[in-house]
Design a protein with these regions (language model features):
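A short, flexible loop at the N-terminus of ABC-type nucleotide-binding domains that lies
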Residues: 1, 10-24, 74
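The feature captures the beta-strand-to-loop junction immediately N-terminal to the Walker
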Residues: 38-40
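Conserved ABC transporter NBD signature motif
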Residues: 61-69, 229-231
Length: 257
Protein backbone atom coordinates (compact mmCIF):
# COMPACT_ATOMS: atom_id res chain seq x y z
CA UNK A 1 0.00 0.00 0.00
CA UNK A 2 1.10 3.53 -0.80
CA UNK A 3 0.24 6.20 1.75
CA UNK A 4 0.73 9.95 1.63
CA UNK A 5 0.11 11.44 5.07
CA UNK A 6 -0.44 15.12 5.84
CA UNK A 7 1.64 16.28 2.89
CA UNK A 8 2.55 19.95 2.64
CA UNK A 9 4.39 21.34 -0.36
CA UNK A 10 5.00 25.01 -1.05
CA UNK A 11 6.92 26.23 -4.09
CA UNK A 12 9.00 29.43 -3.92
CA UNK A 13 8.35 29.89 -0.22
CA UNK A 14 8.90 33.45 1.00
CA UNK A 15 8.79 35.01 -2.46
CA UNK A 16 6.12 36.84 -4.44
CA UNK A 17 5.71 33.61 -6.43
CA UNK A 18 4.94 31.48 -3.37
CA UNK A 19 2.45 28.76 -4.23
CA UNK A 20 0.99 26.19 -1.88
CA UNK A 21 0.36 23.00 -3.85
CA UNK A 22 -0.56 20.68 -0.97
CA UNK A 23 -1.66 21.38 2.57
CA UNK A 24 -2.54 18.42 4.81
CA UNK A 25 -2.96 16.22 1.73
CA UNK A 26 -3.74 12.55 2.37
CA UNK A 27 -4.06 9.65 -0.06
CA UNK A 28 -3.93 5.85 0.12
CA UNK A 29 -3.52 3.52 -2.86
CA UNK A 30 -4.09 -0.20 -2.33
CA UNK A 31 -1.90 -2.89 -3.82
CA UNK A 32 -3.08 -3.80 -7.31
CA UNK A 33 -5.02 -0.58 -7.87
CA UNK A 34 -4.93 1.08 -11.29
CA UNK A 35 -5.72 4.71 -10.51
CA UNK A 36 -6.49 7.32 -13.16
CA UNK A 37 -5.80 10.89 -12.00
CA UNK A 38 -7.41 13.81 -13.80
CA UNK A 39 -7.71 17.52 -13.11
CA UNK A 40 -7.06 20.96 -14.53
CA UNK A 41 -3.57 22.37 -15.06
CA UNK A 42 -1.98 23.32 -11.75
CA UNK A 43 -4.19 21.01 -9.72
CA UNK A 44 -1.21 19.09 -8.34
CA UNK A 45 -1.22 15.97 -10.51
CA UNK A 46 2.40 16.01 -11.62
CA UNK A 47 3.56 17.25 -8.22
CA UNK A 48 1.84 14.21 -6.73
CA UNK A 49 3.81 11.89 -8.99
CA UNK A 50 7.06 13.75 -8.29
CA UNK A 51 6.52 13.41 -4.54
CA UNK A 52 5.88 9.67 -4.85
CA UNK A 53 8.99 9.20 -6.99
CA UNK A 54 11.16 11.44 -4.82
CA UNK A 55 11.78 13.94 -7.63
CA UNK A 56 10.85 16.81 -5.30
CA UNK A 57 11.05 17.15 -1.53
CA UNK A 58 8.05 17.83 0.68
CA UNK A 59 7.96 20.45 3.42
CA UNK A 60 6.18 18.19 5.89
CA UNK A 61 4.30 14.91 6.04
CA UNK A 62 5.29 11.38 5.13
CA UNK A 63 5.34 8.98 2.19
CA UNK A 64 5.05 5.29 3.08
CA UNK A 65 5.14 2.08 1.08
CA UNK A 66 3.81 -0.96 2.92
CA UNK A 67 4.37 0.87 6.19
CA UNK A 68 7.99 1.78 5.45
CA UNK A 69 8.71 5.52 5.58
CA UNK A 70 10.47 6.50 2.33
CA UNK A 71 10.03 10.27 2.76
CA UNK A 72 13.77 10.93 2.78
CA UNK A 73 14.78 8.11 0.45
CA UNK A 74 16.72 9.30 -2.60
CA UNK A 75 14.99 9.25 -5.97
CA UNK A 76 17.42 6.75 -7.51
CA UNK A 77 16.81 4.33 -4.64
CA UNK A 78 13.03 4.60 -5.03
CA UNK A 79 13.35 3.84 -8.72
CA UNK A 80 14.50 0.33 -7.90
CA UNK A 81 10.86 -0.45 -7.13
CA UNK A 82 9.11 2.31 -9.11
CA UNK A 83 8.87 2.45 -12.90
CA UNK A 84 7.97 5.75 -14.55
CA UNK A 85 6.93 6.58 -18.10
CA UNK A 86 6.90 10.25 -19.09
CA UNK A 87 4.94 12.25 -21.65
CA UNK A 88 8.14 12.76 -23.65
CA UNK A 89 9.27 9.36 -25.04
CA UNK A 90 12.90 10.53 -25.06
CA UNK A 91 12.96 10.67 -21.24
CA UNK A 92 12.58 6.92 -20.88
CA UNK A 93 15.24 5.85 -23.36
CA UNK A 94 18.77 6.68 -24.51
CA UNK A 95 18.34 7.84 -28.14
CA UNK A 96 21.94 7.21 -29.24
CA UNK A 97 21.87 3.56 -28.13
CA UNK A 98 20.06 0.79 -29.98
CA UNK A 99 17.04 -1.10 -28.70
CA UNK A 100 18.98 -4.05 -27.27
CA UNK A 101 21.37 -1.74 -25.42
CA UNK A 102 18.47 0.21 -23.95
CA UNK A 103 16.70 -2.95 -22.84
CA UNK A 104 19.89 -4.32 -21.32
CA UNK A 105 20.33 -1.19 -19.21
CA UNK A 106 16.72 -1.45 -18.01
CA UNK A 107 17.14 -5.17 -17.37
CA UNK A 108 20.07 -4.44 -15.06
CA UNK A 109 18.53 -1.53 -13.16
CA UNK A 110 19.74 -1.52 -9.58
CA UNK A 111 22.55 -3.99 -10.33
CA UNK A 112 26.28 -3.53 -10.76
CA UNK A 113 26.55 -3.16 -14.52
CA UNK A 114 29.09 -1.97 -17.07
CA UNK A 115 28.40 -1.73 -20.80
CA UNK A 116 32.09 -2.37 -21.51
CA UNK A 117 31.57 -5.94 -20.38
CA UNK A 118 29.09 -6.35 -23.20
CA UNK A 119 25.47 -7.44 -23.29
CA UNK A 120 24.56 -10.85 -21.95
CA UNK A 121 23.90 -12.76 -25.17
CA UNK A 122 21.61 -15.20 -23.40
CA UNK A 123 19.20 -12.31 -22.81
CA UNK A 124 19.03 -11.04 -26.38
CA UNK A 125 16.50 -13.69 -27.48
CA UNK A 126 14.47 -12.84 -24.38
CA UNK A 127 14.46 -9.17 -25.37
CA UNK A 128 13.38 -10.05 -28.91
CA UNK A 129 10.49 -12.15 -27.60
CA UNK A 130 9.29 -9.18 -25.53
CA UNK A 131 9.51 -6.94 -28.60
CA UNK A 132 7.68 -9.49 -30.76
CA UNK A 133 4.76 -9.44 -28.33
CA UNK A 134 4.35 -5.70 -28.97
CA UNK A 135 3.40 -6.34 -32.62
CA UNK A 136 5.22 -3.18 -33.68
CA UNK A 137 7.99 -4.84 -35.70
CA UNK A 138 10.66 -3.77 -33.23
CA UNK A 139 12.14 -7.26 -33.01
CA UNK A 140 13.55 -6.64 -36.51
CA UNK A 141 15.00 -3.23 -35.60
CA UNK A 142 17.10 -4.12 -32.58
CA UNK A 143 20.29 -2.56 -34.01
CA UNK A 144 18.63 0.77 -34.85
CA UNK A 145 19.30 3.75 -32.54
CA UNK A 146 16.20 4.36 -30.46
CA UNK A 147 16.23 8.02 -31.53
CA UNK A 148 15.32 6.88 -35.06
CA UNK A 149 12.08 5.20 -33.93
CA UNK A 150 8.65 6.81 -34.08
CA UNK A 151 7.21 8.40 -30.96
CA UNK A 152 4.81 5.51 -30.48
CA UNK A 153 7.53 2.90 -30.85
CA UNK A 154 9.72 4.74 -28.36
CA UNK A 155 6.88 5.04 -25.88
CA UNK A 156 6.10 1.34 -26.19
CA UNK A 157 9.77 0.61 -25.56
CA UNK A 158 9.78 3.00 -22.57
CA UNK A 159 6.79 1.16 -21.12
CA UNK A 160 8.44 -2.22 -21.57
CA UNK A 161 11.73 -0.99 -20.08
CA UNK A 162 9.97 0.51 -17.06
CA UNK A 163 8.39 -2.84 -16.25
CA UNK A 164 11.15 -5.33 -17.09
CA UNK A 165 12.11 -5.87 -13.46
CA UNK A 166 9.78 -6.65 -10.55
CA UNK A 167 8.39 -3.37 -9.25
CA UNK A 168 5.86 -2.12 -6.73
CA UNK A 169 4.51 0.86 -8.65
CA UNK A 170 4.15 2.01 -12.23
CA UNK A 171 3.85 5.77 -12.65
CA UNK A 172 2.42 7.03 -15.96
CA UNK A 173 2.82 10.77 -16.45
CA UNK A 174 0.52 11.66 -19.37
CA UNK A 175 2.31 8.97 -21.36
CA UNK A 176 -0.04 9.17 -24.37
CA UNK A 177 -0.37 12.96 -24.55
CA UNK A 178 2.31 13.44 -27.23
CA UNK A 179 0.98 10.68 -29.50
CA UNK A 180 -1.53 10.72 -32.33
CA UNK A 181 -4.94 9.19 -31.48
CA UNK A 182 -4.32 5.83 -33.17
CA UNK A 183 -0.91 5.37 -31.57
CA UNK A 184 -2.26 6.49 -28.20
CA UNK A 185 -4.90 3.75 -28.38
CA UNK A 186 -2.19 1.19 -29.11
CA UNK A 187 -0.12 2.36 -26.14
CA UNK A 188 -3.12 2.31 -23.80
CA UNK A 189 -4.01 -1.25 -24.80
CA UNK A 190 -0.39 -2.25 -24.22
CA UNK A 191 -0.45 -0.46 -20.86
CA UNK A 192 -3.57 -2.31 -19.77
CA UNK A 193 -2.09 -5.64 -20.88
CA UNK A 194 1.15 -5.09 -18.95
CA UNK A 195 -0.63 -3.86 -15.82
CA UNK A 196 -2.95 -6.88 -15.81
CA UNK A 197 -0.21 -9.43 -16.52
CA UNK A 198 2.17 -8.07 -13.89
CA UNK A 199 -0.48 -7.05 -11.37
CA UNK A 200 1.47 -3.87 -10.70
CA UNK A 201 -0.06 -0.99 -8.75
CA UNK A 202 -0.40 1.85 -11.26
CA UNK A 203 -1.06 5.57 -11.08
CA UNK A 204 -1.81 7.25 -14.41
CA UNK A 205 -2.13 11.00 -14.84
CA UNK A 206 -4.07 11.84 -17.98
CA UNK A 207 -6.06 14.62 -19.62
CA UNK A 208 -7.89 12.06 -21.76
CA UNK A 209 -11.23 11.52 -20.01
CA UNK A 210 -12.04 8.52 -22.20
CA UNK A 211 -8.93 6.70 -20.98
CA UNK A 212 -9.54 7.79 -17.38
CA UNK A 213 -13.02 6.24 -17.51
CA UNK A 214 -12.17 3.18 -19.61
CA UNK A 215 -9.03 1.99 -17.83
CA UNK A 216 -8.31 1.14 -14.22
CA UNK A 217 -10.46 0.45 -11.20
CA UNK A 218 -10.30 3.89 -9.57
CA UNK A 219 -10.52 7.51 -10.70
CA UNK A 220 -9.40 10.61 -8.82
CA UNK A 221 -10.08 14.20 -9.81
CA UNK A 222 -7.86 16.88 -8.33
CA UNK A 223 -8.30 20.63 -7.97
CA UNK A 224 -5.95 23.06 -6.25
CA UNK A 225 -4.19 20.31 -4.33
CA UNK A 226 -7.33 18.52 -3.18
CA UNK A 227 -9.05 15.32 -4.30
CA UNK A 228 -12.59 16.39 -5.17
CA UNK A 229 -13.69 13.11 -6.76
CA UNK A 230 -12.72 9.58 -5.77
CA UNK A 231 -14.62 6.66 -7.26
CA UNK A 232 -13.66 3.02 -7.63
CA UNK A 233 -15.00 -0.27 -8.93
CA UNK A 234 -18.80 -0.14 -9.40
CA UNK A 235 -19.02 3.61 -8.79
CA UNK A 236 -16.30 4.27 -11.34
CA UNK A 237 -17.90 1.95 -13.88
CA UNK A 238 -21.12 3.96 -13.66
CA UNK A 239 -19.34 7.30 -14.14
CA UNK A 240 -19.53 8.85 -17.60
CA UNK A 241 -17.46 11.46 -19.39
CA UNK A 242 -20.45 13.82 -19.12
CA UNK A 243 -20.39 13.40 -15.33
CA UNK A 244 -16.74 14.45 -15.28
CA UNK A 245 -17.34 17.39 -17.62
CA UNK A 246 -20.22 18.58 -15.44
CA UNK A 247 -17.89 18.60 -12.45
CA UNK A 248 -15.23 20.49 -14.42
CA UNK A 249 -17.83 23.09 -15.40
CA UNK A 250 -19.05 23.37 -11.83
CA UNK A 251 -15.52 24.03 -10.63
CA UNK A 252 -14.99 26.62 -13.35
CA UNK A 253 -18.08 28.51 -12.21
CA UNK A 254 -17.19 28.30 -8.52
CA UNK A 255 -13.55 29.29 -8.87
CA UNK A 256 -13.73 31.45 -11.97
CA UNK A 257 -11.20 29.47 -14.00
Amino acid sequence: MLELRHIEKIYNRGTVNEQCIFKDFNLSVNDGDFVSVIGSNGSGKTSLLNIICGSIDIDSGAVLINGDDITHKNEYLRHRSIGRVYQDPSKGTCPSMNIIENMSIADNKGKSYNMRRGINRSRINFYREILRDLNLGLEDKTDIPVGALSGGQRQALSLVMATMNPLKFLILDEHTAALDPKTAETIMKLTDKIVREKGVTTIMVTHNLKYAIEYGNRILMMHEGHVILDKEDVEKASTSIDDILDLFNQISLEYGN
